[in-house]
Amino acid sequence: GMSVMVLPGRNPVVLAKELATMDLLSDGRVEIGLGAGWMISDYEQLGIPYDAPGVRIDRFLEGLGIIKQCMQPGAFSQHGTHYNVTGYDGLPKPVQAKVPVLIGGGGKRVLSIAAREADIVGINPSMHAGVVGPEAFAHMTEAAVDEKVAIVRAGAGDRLADIEMNIRAFLVNVTDDGAGARSRLAGMLSVDEAMLLSSPFALIGSPAELTERLLERRERWGFSYVIVGAEDVDKFAPVV
């Protein structure tokens, strides 16, 4: 299924009803992945204005509050800049008393929100340009991830131990020729080969090498929840 839904592109009340219904049908297996959205094409395809980052994040924060309230017993009202809800008692209610929320982000404000509000925090590259390009690779380095994780740790306070850290590996190749694969990919992407070895967004190497790397990254950054794309699932099975 999808990892993170772009909340500003959805009505939060309708989305909450859909998610609660899925939780009922799956007997409590739903995990809510939400983000403010960064890809311009997502907004263009849906016919939604691609507002400034601050506006998109404000809308996201309001919508997040509504979804959380919908999942709780009783009616509620919430009146904000982007949404107005009056006396709403959303039904159905989910099976889980607290449906886990995953919030993914790459910038300071969204990561700070995630640290306060999420059960699972997804660390992403910064995508201020609105498209995948050189800027994204610059924010995939281990130094950039150090900074992002530090924001989460500072913002989480005493709830840090209850947060699960998540990352998506965008560059995956399970191969016994890890050095050769990294060299070829570095040339294609015009990036430093060493970055492809150290970046937690990349998993390129043999099953044994990748297992060791995943353990190192869990120790350093706390990443215990790692996502690979559907296209990589079968070849990643030996690592699991």
Regions found by a protein language model. Give the residues of each.
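Active-site-adjacent structural elements that line small-molecule/cofactor binding pockets in enzymes
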Residues: 1-240
